[in-house]
C-alpha cells in the first residue's frame, strides 16, 4: 500500500501491515530489510520505479515487510493477467501484484491483501510486446505474442 493509504489504514487498525515491493535495480528492498541503500540487481525496464534515495513521502513510513520482484517475475505475471483476466496492466502494477502474492504466501490463509493497480500497459507497449526486446533481455515471450 502506498505510504499515505498505509498510514491512514494503520491509524485505524494497528494490525494492518505495510509492505514495500521493489523492482530489480532499486535500493528500497535493501533499505527496508537491512537499512542499506544499495541497489539489488540490474536496472529494471520498469520506468519511474527503482529509486536509490529516501524521499519525503518515505521518511516516516513504517514498512513491516519488503519484497523484491525481478523483471522476469513481473512480465510473466503481466502476461498471465492479460491472458486470464483481461487486465492490460503496466509494469509498476505487475511489481505490486507480485508483491501482494509474495505477501499472501508469507502471511498464509485468512488474511486480506490490498494492492494498487497504478498503471496500464500503454506506457510500456514498445517493450512489453516487442519480441526482440524481450529476447534481448532474457524475458519470457507469451505464446499469444
PLM regions: where:
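Active-site/ligand-binding loops adjacent to catalytic centers
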Residues: 11-91, 128-145
Amino acid at each position: 500500500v502506498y505510504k499515505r493509504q498505509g498510514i491512514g489504514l494503520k491509524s485505524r487498525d494497528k494490525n494492518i501491515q505495510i509492505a514495500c515491493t521493489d523492482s530489480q535495480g532499486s535500493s528500497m528492498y535493501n533499505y527496508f530489510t537491512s537499512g542499506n541503500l544499495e541497489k539489488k540487481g540490474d536496472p529494471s525496464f520498469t520506468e519511474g520505479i527503482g529509486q536509490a534515495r529516501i524521499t519525503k513521502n518515505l521518511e516516516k513510513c513504517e514498512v513491516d515487510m519488503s519484497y523484491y520482484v525481478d523483471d522476469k517475475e513481473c512480465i510473466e505475471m503481466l502476461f498471465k493477467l492479460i491472458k486470464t483476466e483481461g487486465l492490460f496492466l503496466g509494469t509498476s502494477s505487475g511489481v505490486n501484484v507480485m508483491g501482494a502474492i509474495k505477501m499472501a504466501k508469507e502471511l498464509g490463509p485468512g488474511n486480506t491483501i490490498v494492492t494498487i493497480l497504478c498503471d496500464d500497459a500503454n506506457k510500456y507497449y514498445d517493450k512489453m510486446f516487442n519480441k526482440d526486446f524481450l529476447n534481448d533481455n532474457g524475458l519470457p515471450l507469451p505464446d499469444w505474442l
